[in-house]
Design a protein with these regions (language model features):
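Extended, low-polarity transmembrane helix blocks
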Residues: 1-47, 73, 77, 84-167
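Solvent-exposed, well-ordered loop and adjacent helix/strand elements within mature globular domains
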Residues: 41-75
Length: 167
Protein backbone atom coordinates (compact mmCIF):
# COMPACT_ATOMS: atom_id res chain seq x y z
CA UNK A 1 0.00 0.00 0.00
CA UNK A 2 2.89 2.37 0.70
CA UNK A 3 4.29 2.07 -2.82
CA UNK A 4 0.94 2.91 -4.35
CA UNK A 5 0.63 6.01 -2.16
CA UNK A 6 4.14 7.17 -3.10
CA UNK A 7 3.42 6.60 -6.80
CA UNK A 8 0.18 8.58 -6.60
CA UNK A 9 1.90 11.40 -4.72
CA UNK A 10 4.74 11.57 -7.25
CA UNK A 11 2.50 11.39 -10.31
CA UNK A 12 0.42 14.38 -9.20
CA UNK A 13 3.34 16.51 -10.35
CA UNK A 14 2.96 15.24 -13.93
CA UNK A 15 -0.67 16.33 -14.14
CA UNK A 16 -1.55 19.10 -16.59
CA UNK A 17 -2.57 22.26 -14.76
CA UNK A 18 -4.09 25.43 -16.15
CA UNK A 19 -1.71 28.30 -16.75
CA UNK A 20 -1.39 30.90 -14.01
CA UNK A 21 -2.95 34.25 -14.75
CA UNK A 22 -0.66 36.67 -16.58
CA UNK A 23 0.71 39.76 -14.89
CA UNK A 24 -1.20 41.97 -17.30
CA UNK A 25 -3.27 41.85 -20.46
CA UNK A 26 -0.36 43.46 -22.30
CA UNK A 27 1.93 40.58 -21.36
CA UNK A 28 -0.69 38.14 -22.60
CA UNK A 29 -0.93 39.96 -25.94
CA UNK A 30 2.87 40.10 -26.26
CA UNK A 31 3.01 36.34 -25.69
CA UNK A 32 0.41 35.81 -28.43
CA UNK A 33 2.42 38.04 -30.80
CA UNK A 34 5.62 36.13 -29.99
CA UNK A 35 3.80 32.83 -30.55
CA UNK A 36 2.49 34.04 -33.93
CA UNK A 37 5.97 35.14 -34.98
CA UNK A 38 7.43 31.78 -33.93
CA UNK A 39 4.73 29.90 -35.86
CA UNK A 40 5.49 31.91 -39.01
CA UNK A 41 9.22 31.31 -38.55
CA UNK A 42 8.97 27.58 -37.85
CA UNK A 43 6.59 26.96 -40.77
CA UNK A 44 9.02 28.74 -43.09
CA UNK A 45 11.96 26.80 -41.70
CA UNK A 46 10.24 23.41 -41.80
CA UNK A 47 8.76 23.98 -45.25
CA UNK A 48 12.18 23.28 -46.74
CA UNK A 49 14.26 22.01 -43.83
CA UNK A 50 16.74 20.29 -46.15
CA UNK A 51 17.66 23.74 -47.51
CA UNK A 52 17.54 25.36 -44.04
CA UNK A 53 20.55 23.36 -42.82
CA UNK A 54 22.91 24.77 -45.51
CA UNK A 55 21.68 28.27 -44.62
CA UNK A 56 22.81 27.71 -41.03
CA UNK A 57 26.09 26.25 -42.36
CA UNK A 58 26.64 29.61 -44.05
CA UNK A 59 27.38 31.16 -40.65
CA UNK A 60 30.72 29.26 -40.63
CA UNK A 61 30.11 27.79 -37.19
CA UNK A 62 32.69 25.45 -35.66
CA UNK A 63 31.90 21.74 -35.56
CA UNK A 64 31.23 21.04 -39.20
CA UNK A 65 28.11 19.57 -40.73
CA UNK A 66 27.08 17.59 -37.65
CA UNK A 67 27.06 20.66 -35.41
CA UNK A 68 25.21 22.66 -38.06
CA UNK A 69 22.51 20.00 -38.38
CA UNK A 70 22.22 19.79 -34.61
CA UNK A 71 21.91 23.59 -34.31
CA UNK A 72 19.30 23.77 -37.08
CA UNK A 73 17.28 21.07 -35.35
CA UNK A 74 17.68 22.78 -31.97
CA UNK A 75 16.42 26.07 -33.39
CA UNK A 76 13.29 24.51 -34.89
CA UNK A 77 12.55 22.28 -31.88
CA UNK A 78 12.96 25.16 -29.42
CA UNK A 79 10.61 27.33 -31.48
CA UNK A 80 7.97 24.57 -31.54
CA UNK A 81 8.26 23.70 -27.85
CA UNK A 82 8.00 27.38 -26.85
CA UNK A 83 4.42 27.52 -28.14
CA UNK A 84 2.60 25.68 -25.30
CA UNK A 85 3.91 28.16 -22.71
CA UNK A 86 3.17 31.19 -24.87
CA UNK A 87 -0.36 30.00 -25.67
CA UNK A 88 -0.98 29.29 -21.96
CA UNK A 89 -2.01 25.69 -22.58
CA UNK A 90 -2.65 23.35 -19.62
CA UNK A 91 0.76 21.80 -18.89
CA UNK A 92 2.56 20.01 -16.12
CA UNK A 93 4.79 22.34 -14.09
CA UNK A 94 7.97 20.80 -15.52
CA UNK A 95 6.74 21.14 -19.10
CA UNK A 96 5.74 24.75 -18.43
CA UNK A 97 9.29 25.56 -17.30
CA UNK A 98 10.77 23.62 -20.23
CA UNK A 99 8.55 25.49 -22.68
CA UNK A 100 9.53 28.81 -21.09
CA UNK A 101 13.19 27.88 -21.50
CA UNK A 102 12.66 26.91 -25.13
CA UNK A 103 11.17 30.33 -25.86
CA UNK A 104 14.23 32.01 -24.40
CA UNK A 105 16.67 29.61 -26.11
CA UNK A 106 15.11 30.24 -29.53
CA UNK A 107 15.55 33.99 -29.17
CA UNK A 108 19.10 33.68 -27.78
CA UNK A 109 20.18 31.41 -30.64
CA UNK A 110 18.93 33.90 -33.23
CA UNK A 111 20.62 36.80 -31.41
CA UNK A 112 23.91 34.86 -31.38
CA UNK A 113 23.58 34.05 -35.09
CA UNK A 114 22.70 37.69 -35.78
CA UNK A 115 25.82 38.91 -33.99
CA UNK A 116 27.94 36.36 -35.87
CA UNK A 117 26.45 37.53 -39.18
CA UNK A 118 27.19 41.18 -38.41
CA UNK A 119 30.76 40.75 -37.15
CA UNK A 120 31.90 38.18 -39.72
CA UNK A 121 32.92 39.01 -43.26
CA UNK A 122 30.76 36.23 -44.67
CA UNK A 123 28.46 37.46 -47.43
CA UNK A 124 25.19 35.56 -46.93
CA UNK A 125 22.14 36.50 -48.94
CA UNK A 126 19.58 34.84 -46.63
CA UNK A 127 19.80 34.57 -42.86
CA UNK A 128 17.30 31.72 -42.62
CA UNK A 129 15.07 33.34 -40.00
CA UNK A 130 12.03 32.82 -42.20
CA UNK A 131 13.39 29.75 -43.96
CA UNK A 132 14.45 29.60 -47.58
CA UNK A 133 11.31 30.94 -49.25
CA UNK A 134 11.44 34.42 -47.68
CA UNK A 135 14.81 36.13 -47.84
CA UNK A 136 15.90 38.10 -44.80
CA UNK A 137 19.39 39.51 -45.39
CA UNK A 138 22.02 38.50 -42.86
CA UNK A 139 23.10 41.95 -41.76
CA UNK A 140 21.72 44.54 -39.38
CA UNK A 141 18.14 43.60 -40.33
CA UNK A 142 18.66 40.07 -39.02
CA UNK A 143 20.23 41.33 -35.82
CA UNK A 144 17.37 43.80 -35.33
CA UNK A 145 14.82 40.99 -35.93
CA UNK A 146 16.68 38.78 -33.44
CA UNK A 147 16.77 41.52 -30.80
CA UNK A 148 13.02 42.07 -31.24
CA UNK A 149 12.58 38.31 -30.73
CA UNK A 150 14.67 38.57 -27.57
CA UNK A 151 12.55 41.43 -26.22
CA UNK A 152 9.35 39.52 -26.97
CA UNK A 153 10.76 36.39 -25.30
CA UNK A 154 11.85 38.18 -22.13
CA UNK A 155 8.60 40.15 -21.90
CA UNK A 156 6.58 36.95 -22.36
CA UNK A 157 8.65 35.11 -19.76
CA UNK A 158 8.22 37.96 -17.28
CA UNK A 159 4.51 38.37 -17.92
CA UNK A 160 3.60 34.69 -17.86
CA UNK A 161 6.14 33.58 -15.24
CA UNK A 162 4.98 30.17 -13.94
CA UNK A 163 6.35 30.48 -10.40
CA UNK A 164 4.06 31.47 -7.56
CA UNK A 165 3.88 35.23 -7.25
CA UNK A 166 3.24 36.95 -3.95
CA UNK A 167 0.39 39.39 -4.16
Amino acid sequence: MGIRKAYTKDMKFARALPAPSPRSETAKKVAWIYAAVLVIMVVGQLFSFEKFIPLIAGYWLPGGNGATTLLAGLIVVSEVFALPFLLRMPLSPLMRWFSLGCGLVAAVLWVILGVIAVVSDNAMTNSGILGTKVTVPSDGAQLLWAVVLGVLAVWSAWGLWPADRKK
